[in-house]
Amino acid sequence: MNYPNGQQKVTTNHVVQKQDNRMFSNRGMSLEDDINATNEFYLETNQAVIHKKPTPVQIVNVHYPKRSAAVITEAYFKQASTTDYNGIYKGKYIDFEAKETKNKTSFPLANIHEHQINHMQKVIDQQGICFMLIRFTAHDETYLLDAKALLTFWNLKQDGGKKSIPYDMIRNQSQLIPFHYQKRVDYLAAVDKLYF
C-alpha cells in the first residue's frame, strides 16, 4: 500500500517461536490447584480424607443494610498458624505444607515460618505423618521431603548454617512425585514408600 507521502509500509513477518521445554505435567497449574484436585480424587476413590485448611480472615467492617443482607466491606487475611493441609490416611493423621519456588538451585528456608516448624514438630511428637511438598517450577518437579529432614535443615540454619536447602540434597533426600492425569500430585504413593 502506498501512503500519501509516497512511502510504502514495510511489513516484517517475524514469527517468534517460544520454546516450551516444560513437561506435560504443569500446564500452568499451581501446586495448590494440583494438590486440591488430587485430594478430591483421593476422597472420591476412598483412599484418604485430606483437606486444605482455610486461611483465617480478620473481618474489619461489615455493612448491614438489613439483617438478612450483611455485606463484608473490609477484611484482611491473617497469617495461618499451622500448615496447609491435614487429614487421615490408612488410620494415621497426615499433615503437610506445600511450597513452590522458581529457584533452580535451592529451596529458600525463608519460605517457611517458625510457627509452621513448631507445628510440624508437634505432629511428629504425636507420631503423625508430617512432610513438605516442594515444587521446583524451573525443573517442573515436585518432591516430598519428610518433616524430620526439614527440621534438620531448619536447625542448621538457626545455628548459622545455610539459609536454603540445595536442590541436589532435596533430590537425594526426598521422594520425586510423578505427574498423573487424575492424581496430578500423587503424594500418597511417596507416603506409602516412606511411612508404611
From Swiss-Prot:
Cellular compartment(s): Cytoplasm
Catalytic activity field: Endonucleolytic cleavage at a junction such as a reciprocal single-stranded crossover between two homologous DNA duplexes (Holliday junction)
InterPro entries: Resolv_RecU (IPR004612), Restrct_endonuc-II-like (IPR011335), tRNA_endonuc-like_dom_sf (IPR011856)
GO BP terms: chromosome segregation; DNA recombination; DNA repair
Cofactor note: Binds 1 Mg(2+) ion per subunit.
GO terms, molecular function: endonuclease activity; magnesium ion binding; nucleic acid binding
Residues binding Mg(2+): T82, D84, E97, Q116
Superkingdom as given in the UniProt entry: Bacteria
Pfam family, one: RecU
Protein family: Belongs to the RecU family.
Protein task: Endonuclease that resolves Holliday junction intermediates in genetic recombination. Cleaves mobile four-strand junctions by introducing symmetrical nicks in paired strands. Promotes annealing of linear ssDNA with homologous dsDNA. Required for DNA repair, homologous recombination and chromosome segregation.
UniProt-recorded name of the protein: Holliday junction resolvase RecU
Biological classification of the source: Bacteria, Bacillati, Bacillota, Bacilli, Bacillales
